[in-house]
Design a protein with these regions (language model features):
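Conserved N-terminal beta1-alpha1 strand-loop-helix module at the mouth
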Residues: 1-236
Length: 236
């Protein structure tokens, strides 16, 4: 199953709608951005989401609250993560791999893919992370845009992520929307997909777009399972 991360949440109502629609991860941005949230609001959102999960015992998925940071001192990342009860932290800046050793929560490390970069180059860039944090590390691949640390709405060549997705848990971000998320899943087979601007209307999260995006992911997963079964039917 492809995990869905709804990033850039700034309102509790949108977080709850995402969870209700079947999101696996929600992202809260603690870096300079139009989607920046303060720690009090973030804590409120996380508490509401986890409270909803407790009330809805039928919900099978684990909801993972992710805090997104950019070049923030490790001590501050750990403080915010503890205060807001985050499950993971996403490092979307220029943090060196050794920095990960100082982070107390499981990590998602963003790596920006440059134009014309080859798949072997991407693999080489990700390999040191496994040595620093082991198999618990998740990688997020996003499009490299000069002066930007994500949320640009620009896509990269998904074919270069194929090899990485076979070896590591990889989330693909950048330019995703309801219309193209099925294609990236078919091409790269990632652990997860990340969306922010692709589910917004006039810069604000749109609940109908959130639902449509998640539905598109689940539909693609179902189609791929069906195709796999038809090629290799279970016998006996």
């Amino acid at each position: 199953m492809t995990r869905v991360k709804i990033c850039g949440i700034t309102e509790t109502i949108h977080a709850l709608a995402a969870v209700e629609a079947g999101a696996d991860l929600i992202g809260l941005v603690f870096a300079p951005s139009k989607r920046l949230v303060d720690v009090e609001l973030a804590k409120e959102i996380v508490t509401s989401v986890k409270g909803q999960k407790e009330l809805n015992k039928r919900a099978e998925q684990e909801i993972i609250a992710v805090g997104v940071f950019v070049n923030t001192p490790a001590a501050e990342v750990n403080r915010v993560a503890e205060y807001c009860n985050l499950d993971r932290v996403q490092l979307s800046g220029d943090e060196p791999w050794d920095y990960l050793r100082a982070i107390e929560r499981p990590t998602i490390k963003a790596v920006r893919v440059r134009r014309h970069q080859r798949s072997e180059d991407v693999l080489a860039e990700l390999a040191p992370g496994e040595q620093r944090q082991g198999s618990d590390l998740i990688y997020l691949l996003d499009c490299h845009i000069a002066g930007s640390y994500g949320g640009s709405g620009q896509a990269f060549d998904w074919k270069v992520a194929q090899d990485a997705a076979e070896r590591f848990p990889v989330i693909i971000a950048g330019g995703l929307c309801t219309e193209n998320v099925g294609e990236v899943i078919r091409i790269a087979g990632p652990w997860g997909v990340d969306v922010s601007s692709g589910i917004e209307s006039e810069g604000i999260k749109d609940i109908s777009k959130i639902k449509a995006f998640i539905a598109a992911v689940r539909h693609t997963d179902q189609e791929l399972r069906k195709q796999s079964y038809e090629k290799n039917p279970v016998t006996g």
